[in-house]
Amino acid sequence: MIKRFGVVKLMFCVAIVACRPVWAAAASADVDKQIRADWAREEQVTRKLKTDSYAAVQGVIKRGRLMIADFRKAGAVAAADKAAGKLDAIDAQCKVLLWVKIKPGTYEKLYFEARYAVRELAFANPKIDFKELLFVRRHWPRWNHQCSHRVGEAQKPGANLCVLTSLSPDAKVREVLSGKYTTGGIGRPDLSYDAKRIVFPHAALRAKATGYRYGDPAFRGGECLTYDIYEVGLDGKNPKRLTNDPLNEDTEPCYLPDGRIAFTSSRAGRLVQCGDWALACGIYSMKTDGSDVRQITEPKEGEFYPSMLADGRIMYTRWDYVMKGYNVIQQLWAVNPDGRRAQMVYGDHYAFARGPIAFQEARQIPGTSKVICVGAAHHNSGVGPIMIVDLAGNRGGPDSMRRITPQVGYPEIKFASEVLDKYKNSQHAARGRMDAGWYTSPYPLSKNQYIATYSFDKSNNSVHGYALYLCDVHGNRDLIYRGKGYSCYSPLPIRTRKKPRIIPDMVTGVDPKTPGVLTVSNIYKGLDGIKPGEVKYLRVLETHSKIVHTTPQRCDVGVGSGWDPRGVLGVVPVEADGSVHFEVPPFKQIFFEALDKDYLEIRRMRNFMNVMPGEKTGCIGCHEPYGTLPGKAGKGGPIAMKRPASKLIAPPWGDGAMNFKRVVQPVLDRKCISCHDGSTNVKKTDKKSFDLRGTQMVIAPAPHDRDQGPQHAVSDSFLKLLSYVEYIKVGGHQGIRLPLAVNATGSRASKLMKVLTGGGHYKVTLSTDDWRAIAAWIDCNAPFYGGWDEIVIGKKAPRRPKKAAVPPADQVKSAAERRKAIAGKLPSGTKLEAFLNCGVELTSDKKGTVRITQTSGSPWTLTKGKIAGVPATQRLISFDGKEVVFEVSGLTAARSYSVALTWWDYNAAGRKQSVWVFSTDRRYGSRVVNTSDMPDYEKRKQPPAEISFELGSEQAKAGKCIIAIRKDVGSNCVISEIWITSKNTGASK
């Protein structure tokens, strides 16, 4: 037995020498080393395996055999057979080794042999019919948000369009651009159909660089300017500028088959409602000289990443909040190049919590109905796992999508028990990991093979971690090229392409006031449980884009109602067969609600559509499954089509966004307050104590998200009625309960309308107009505000629970001792105005004239144990992932003020922070303390640092200001104490 094994060992060693691949022998030592290192890191990061293991070798063989099967189906039999022979031999040797004692490195040799065999096959794919690859050499954008790719001001300088002259790690790289075009930032480009020209976004270098203040709506700055679009020959000659708009971002260009260029732009002047520092971009088109700019889409939160479908439509990602949670807020849409027939093509799966939040960078896979895209987070740099989505499948469920990089999880998603069982056996059951690297910008070569950029780094915002890879759907991945000191982005094969179908322009020349016409064949399709004849009206509503900066910059229009004002445009009749035929105004963001005979909602639409002037379009039913046929219609077709299109019947309370005080409060004044007058001399159970006068404004509670800034106020009557209303609580990840069944929300499901039915509430009877007003308010998702100019700020509501009214005695004593110690060290003529012990107090001593109030930040105790030389007050901190904010009030021009604070890095070395001072509306501000290293206690035992700065005379004259402690580097920002001192200036008030 021993001799037999000895012979086997000898045969194995001979086989290893004999199988040395030609590809590896031809590669230089440096390239071979780079490829092997990449493979080893792939196993470690992606699969948690070592290359010197049986499992790793078998994984390569398994994935390789799946690729071999693809090649055989494609007719590349010779290449497939060659690779199969190599893998079979390696597999046989590998299995023999299970029975013998082997030396370290034996499996690793087989692993690399197998990888080279598969790599050779992958690059032999007939679909790789090009020699050169265009890509962007860049640094990753400055901040971790998917908006950053579309913001020139967020780019880190130093970028170029590059041509990789062969698909090899040691290939020569030819730089297309030169001079000033290489000093700024470059975004996602496109290559012309004849492969001779490149259109690309370029952000020029700013003459005087500033830091980019992410999240600050009033700030303009950065190291680069805004994006503009340029075109250049593939040879780099004669670059020409196509757009020139310093106030807007023009980016993500895409060649259209008719010779025009589509692009993403912020020129509609709209803002993102969850944070109005972000620009809401839409899709536009222009001629190749930059003239004749036309708006294609009506953006709400944004529409971006345009690419062409073979049928001539432009596919893009839409981001919108229309009464739905955060689960699926960025879906795939398509539109004709003239703006007609904008419709969702995939992503309407609210019931599915295991799917990605955003579908980005989608491109159609040649010869199929499928697209490849990134399953990105909302709050990352647009990266995640690679997805394949079938546009011919069910657009409202996960069955039509496939995650082809299963080790990489869907970032930022939340889970709930109600969806786990349903999908426990599906490909989506595995959550995936957040430490397996990140993919972006995939480009499909065939139905199974694609090029993408990938980074091993745990941080998705790695400045220079992204490299180019050849990948397939089976998990095979091979390095094409990795740059040194920069990232690669948006690979495009340099080859000619077949132009998509040209869809005729039916909009140009039409009077822009011409209404569109919509048709619903049978509204009962999709309304399970609703009997024919039950739907009597279709309500047409409008959601409004944000166009002005507000304080707060993110503001709920009610209490979990959502961030967008919305109102009723009108109603139209529904025929007995469920058909509807009606006019709608162009360019508006509209959605619909099916109503019963009493104008109560049966079901609502939770995204929006729009029509172009003169456009005629329609749908089958209400939330009908994708691909549903109209079914049998009466003789001669749908009844509604036998007459002219209905015109909208405006609501009796007038047009405009729904406003509680304008529409509902007058009804309460007429019908309710004679009883519900808020009398205080009665029992709380008495109807009179239920005050519906609406005379008091109170701070709005926040069911999921507080406003980003001071919390808004609502009337007390609004809050009282709200408890009797069934509406969708927007915010957080509440989309897991959607879509809701019919009658699940809105006026038909609300207790308020049931109480008011038929005079059952103390014989109170409402007119039809009053009844409709209250029902419509509920069905607009119960908003309080109807516009951005109406917002009433209540107070600065801290993003944390209030501390106990009376802090523990030891903390009170420590703070008092600290105040006394600080005051005792002040020079003559200097007064301690206010002191705040962060982490314990929200407001400084109320006895003083000057007040410090903390408006954001959470409390934390660094250590309960004493530290020599460190006051107890400095062991308590406030922290925040972005900034800890204080409002200072009670200042006067008669005194000059100094601010001092203490901070330290107790347990996480590497933090860096800065300090900013703003006007209370944040329109004006400046940095008063530059980015500073925090004292490192963990490693160097450095004590807390005391930082001080002067407040300007403008703050003293204004009487108040905002002080923000900002995180520049690290996981969060921290502060222990803050105090203000003053001296008499002799100036008059």
What are these regions (language model features)?
Residues A25-Q44, K48-A55, G59-K62, G85-I102, ...:
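Aromatic- and Gly/Pro-enriched helix-to-coil junctions and flexible linker segments
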Residues G75-E175:
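Long amphipathic alpha-helical scaffold segments
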Residues L133, T183-Y193, L247-R260, K300-M315, ...:
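Conserved beta-propeller blade repeats
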Residues F135-K156, P201-L225, F263-L279, Y316-Q330, ...:
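Short, conserved, GDST-rich strand-edge loop motifs in beta-rich repeat architectures
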Residues P169-G184, L234-N248, K287-E301, N336-A358, ...:
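Multi-bladed beta-propeller domains
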